[in-house]
């Protein structure tokens, strides 16, 4: 297959279709619905071990701490849920998104910090697992089962998509985690 980076005119939808075709060619027996499991879809044993662990997830205490942060009132009485549609339910799958006003790709974590800032609170460090890590882990559970709904709409968003695509394939030129997907043989 042709290089996706070299195919600069491919739309995000064309890239998505090319990726699906590549994986269906490499793993024809695996249903598309299993792709959500990532590498676990390639090993029944690994998937069974994961499912067993998830019966009593070792991170449940962290989720609980995140919930406490999510529900704790700010000094002004509001909570994180006031910053997100439907209190944060079914929103995480809409990230990241492109904001044309700032010309930035906005992550869920960036909007969590915007919520803190807008409510007069100190923002969390992105690498602080005790705050940002736990609140993000909890907040994402509010979107469990939600399909990913990332959109690339408009010239600015498309430019950011192309930048991300170039970065991804440059970093994965010789890698791809053993999938063989890299600049030299990615879909396109």
Stretch-by-stretch model annotation:
Residues 40-52, 63, 69, 73-117, ...:
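Gly/Gly-Pro-rich "capping" loops immediately C-terminal to redox-active cysteine motifs
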Residues 1-3, 188:
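Intrinsic structural disorder
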Residues 3-61, 99-174:
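Post-cleavage N-terminal segment of exported redox proteins
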Residues 66-69, 158-188:
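Conserved small-residue-rich
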